[in-house]
Amino acid sequence: MNRRFWFGLLIVLSVLPAACASVPKDPQARAVYERNNDPLEPLNRQIFAFNLRADQYVMRPVTKAYRAVTTPDFRKGVRTFFANLHTPVTVVNDILQLNLPEAGKELSRFTINSTLGFFGIFDVADRLGIAPQAQSFGNTLGVWGSPPGPFLMLPLLGPSDVRDLIGMGADIAFDPLTYAAVTHDRRTMASILVSMDILEALAKYENSLDLLDDARKNSLDYYAYTRSMYQQYRRAAVDEAAGRKNSEGQKASYEFSLDDFDDEDTE
């Protein structure tokens, strides 16, 4: 996990000086430029094109094979297993956000699902009325008032921003699995953790594949669409964590989270 984060960060930082788009002089174009918050757009579009090729030649064939040899219940179990593994990260961020009631709920979920749910394969806690929620250090930074910073497109990892990139590193530090690799045989644990990373990424991608296909077919500019949806989703997630209201006066929701489609698995 550490290698994945630092590799992406190194690539981004190494090309920042040459990758920035020039600021438009036209007032209307400048307003659009500032709203998109994407000064690295030329570079980001190149990385996005690379990600699409990786999707076409690697992720999509592997995902379709994974879908062909597994059942919807199996795939859902994989997703809930990994969601349960990341619960300690959510608990830490709830505490940092001073949201102690939610931290207590997540601890209850983790205990119930790790025992009665067979290590999180089954979401027993949700059936008992303890709904899941996910927090990240990117959310915590947003609650603390940190702006998102420029939009970033990371190789293979997809859309992000400066705040979430920093948050990714902190979440890795909060993750107990990170220390399992340090305290045990490093080579063996590294192999196990990389395998788990791959399986988790595959499970999440498979669950969102149909949604992504629809978005690609129905958008005139798939990159701009991806950027817009990511930024809206992240604003909603931070507002949700902070308990703020959106422009309609309603509580912000995870409208754009791919996790909302967990129960829409396909054969």
Model-predicted segments: where are they?
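Membrane interface segments of multi-pass transport proteins and intramembrane proteases
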Residues: Y57, K64-D73
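Mid-length scaffold segments of soluble, non-membrane domains
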Residues: N84-V162
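A small/polar active-site loop signature that marks catalytic segments
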Residues: K76
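C-terminal motif of bacterial Sec signal peptides marking the signal peptidase cleavage site
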Residues: L16-A19
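A structured, mid-to-C-terminal "fold-capping" secondary-structure block
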Residues: S22-E34, G145-E267
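Bacterial N-terminal signal peptides that target proteins for export
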Residues: M1-L9
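Post-signal peptide N-terminal segment of mature Sec-exported envelope proteins
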Residues: Q28-Y57, T87
